[in-house]
Design a protein with these regions (language model features):
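N-terminal targeting signals for export/organelle localization
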Residues: 1-40, 44
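Short, small/polar residue-rich loop motifs at catalytic or cofactor-binding pockets
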Residues: 36-38, 60, 158-160
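Short, acidic, Ser/Thr-enriched surface-loop or helix-capping motifs
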Residues: 45-46, 167
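Generic structural signal for well-ordered beta-strand positions
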Residues: 51-52, 173
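Short active-site neighborhood of thiol/selenol oxidoreductases, capturing the structured segment around
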Residues: 54-75
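Structural microenvironment flanking redox-active thiols in thiol-disulfide oxidoreductases
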Residues: 76-137
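Thiol/disulfide oxidoreductase modules built on the thioredoxin-like
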Residues: 133-188
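Short, hydrophobic alpha-helical segments
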Residues: 192-194
């Protein structure tokens, strides 16, 4: 190979190696679509006690944002998460918490959240808080929500419907949609708690 050809190919090789390295770095990042997912929050549990993201440190979390008056997506997602956790061994189940965060703090008081969450079994935490605290938690998880006014003074909440899998250190692992089966969720949970 001539020196001139080598001088022409060297920069192209360096560029290709750099792009491959950048691609590997990008693929390994704990994010979805380039945005980091998860972070600190300060909310209130069903007993009115303050909780933070650190309350769940050492446990894997399935995090879902919704509301108790949700007619379909929220109960379906919570049932799917509960079914997935139910497929785990007792020792694995102890390492997982389902964290249901309301996007409707006006109606979803601590008592309402506790009652609603308990319908889906043990290990389900219903969290609420001030509108500002809910907005902060939603920003950390990149969750969309908005109040939709209806006739007669009633309202519903529009919201993203994604389950976030976080590891025992609170780091983002994966997302699940309504197309994800409880079996597939359980398989991913086993990787995180195993």
């Amino acid at each position: 190979m001539t020196r001139r050809r080598l001088l022409l190919l060297a920069p192209a090789g360096l560029l290709a190696a750099g792009m491959a390295g950048a691609g590997a770095w990008w693929a390994a990042r704990p994010s979805a679509g380039g945005a980091s997912i998860g972070g600190p929050f300060r909310l209130v549990d069903g007993d009115g006690r303050g909780v933070t993201d650190q309350t769940f440190h050492g446990k894997a979390m399935l995090v879902y944002f919704g509301y108790t008056h949700c007619p379909d997506a929220c109960p379906t997602a919570l049932q799917d998460m509960a079914s997935a956790v139910g497929e785990l061994s007792p020792a694995e189940r102890e390492q997982v918490r389902i964290v249901f965060i309301t996007v409707d703090p006006e109606r979803d008081t601590p008592a309402v959240m506790k009652s609603y969450a308990s319908a889906f079994g043990p290990g389900v935490e219903g969290l609420t808080g001030s509108p500002g605290a809910i907005a902060q938690a939603a920003r950390e998880y990149r969750v969309y929500y908005a109040r939709h006014e209806e006739k007669g003074g009633e309202y519903s909440m529009d919201h993203s419907s994604i389950v976030y899998l976080m590891d025992k250190q609170g780091r983002f692992v994966s997302v699940f949609t309504h197309q994800t089966s409880p079996d597939a969720m359980a398989a991913e949970l086993r990787k995180v708690v195993g």
